[in-house]
């Protein structure tokens, strides 16, 4: 999958940060979605290799491109941009390989978040929630909007 492919590049903390996120606190390595912004060459290369191998549909590198997950990295304000760029890069590569007889498609990846609105994080307070349904809905809608604007044909 995408994470395994990214690991093959042996990227450094500096690769993940790029110049733009140099001063953001905390570790960024492992936040694969930010590579849509900081290392689009790597992400595009991965997409291209899937298409060269014969893929008809490629999954965009957008699994955690919502504010909820990106808040752990202090990048919640970049979540929509990450989703957009992940889909846009995939769309560019798919368009290079598409033909009238064999179109290629982009599936925007909408992964789960690291917070849930269905279970309490506190065993002594079963009604407690880390996030509300409305917050979750709003964040996922923002991610999906970025995917659509970036050119995704479908959402996973």
Task: Annotate each language-model stretch with its function.
Residues 1-156:
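Domain-level signal for soluble alpha/beta catalytic cores
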């Amino acid at each position: 999958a995408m994470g395994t492919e990214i690991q093959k590049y042996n990227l450094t903390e500096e690769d993940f940060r790029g110049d733009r996120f140099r001063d953001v606190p905390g570790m960024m390595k492992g936040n694969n979605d930010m590579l849509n912004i900081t290392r689009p060459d790597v992400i595009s290369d991965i997409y291209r290799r899937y298409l060269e191998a014969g893929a008809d549909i490629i999954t965009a590198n957008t699994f955690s491109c919502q504010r909820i997950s990106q808040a752990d990295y202090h990048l919640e304000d970049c979540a929509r941009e990450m989703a957009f760029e992940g889909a846009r890069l995939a769309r560019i590569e798919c368009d290079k390989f598409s033909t009238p007889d064999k179109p290629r498609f982009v599936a925007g990846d909408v992964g789960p978040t690291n917070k849930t609105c269905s279970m309490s994080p506190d065993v002594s307070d079963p009604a407690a929630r880390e996030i509300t349904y409305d917050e979750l809905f709003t964040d996922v809608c923002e991610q999906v909007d970025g995917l659509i604007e970036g050119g995704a044909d479908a959402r996973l």
